[in-house]
Amino acid sequence: MTDVEPSPYGDCKFVARVEHIKTFIQAIKSICFNDYGMVQVSEDGLRITVEQGKSIQATLFMPPGAFMEFRVQDFQCFGVKMNVLSECLSLFGSADCSLRMMYRDKGDPLKIILYPHDDDDVSTECAIKTMDCDEPIDYDQNLKDPDLNVIFVRGPNLSKVFNELEKSAEEFEFVTSPNRPHFKITTVGIMQAVFSVEVAKTSPMMMMFNCKQTVVARYKSQQIRMTNKAMQSATKVAIKTNSVGLLELHLVMQGDSQEEIFIQFFIIPLLNTD
């Protein structure tokens, strides 16, 4: 009889390793706007989704290729406290660390092990309580319209535009159009003070421009501001809107090893009061 070598991870149904966690921590912190997040793991990769009511949703996505190691058995889904996850990942401060995540089965904790690169004799392990959670809202189905407006822009440029906008604004108005102004952001602040930024489709910050209809929609400033942390670290951003103004911001963050982490925001427009 041949002995079968036991797995070093026991009966874990999910095991993953990230060699450098700086970008992963930035991504986690950029979506910590609610207490709880839903973790989904499949052969497609890792997703962590956070929602606030039915007005904004953010999903962090890492494909298997973004990990040094990625193993999953069946589809795994569980909830975690986002602030606990963020704090555990930040235990070594700004020190460069590798990360191992392990999850055994429903009701078991998510184990996080950090290994600082500058000290081979040190590591720390956290066991994060998991819980049952509801399925996230599937906004993606609402953005399958062939007449969708799609714009790709350079992340640092868009972040600069947002930083120039009025900080006390109560609402943001987005205009995407095949005609001028091709892409316009207007803030409406206290006493209805208005400030606008226009970006032509020929602007150097534009990477792709494909708008088939004029869409004008307003959003709560607070929700747009929730994208700031991710925006500051993004290399490029896809902006998508459908005919009713459902807004998707799809951001790409690049890690130290050139791996890509994706952050996807869905923001519900305010009702048209015209």
From Swiss-Prot:
Pfam families: Rad1. Keywords: Cytoplasm, DNA damage, DNA repair, Nucleus. Disulfide bonds: none annotated. It comes from the Eukaryota. InterPro entries: Cell_cycle_checkpoint_Rad1 (IPR003011), DNA_clamp_sf (IPR046938), Rad1_Rec1_Rad17 (IPR003021). Expressed in ovary. One of its GO terms (biological process) is DNA repair. It is found in: Cytoplasm; Nucleus; Nucleus envelope. One of its GO terms (cellular component) is checkpoint clamp complex. Belongs to the rad1 family. Component of the 9-1-1 checkpoint clamp complex consisting of Rad9 isoform A, Rad1 and Hus1-like; the interaction with Hus1-like is direct. Does not interact directly with Rad9; this interaction is probably mediated by Hus1-like. This complex probably also forms with Rad9 isoform B, however 9-1-1 complex containing Rad9 isoform A localizes to the nuclear periphery. This is DNA repair protein Rad1. It comes from Drosophila melanogaster (Fruit fly). The gene is Rad1.
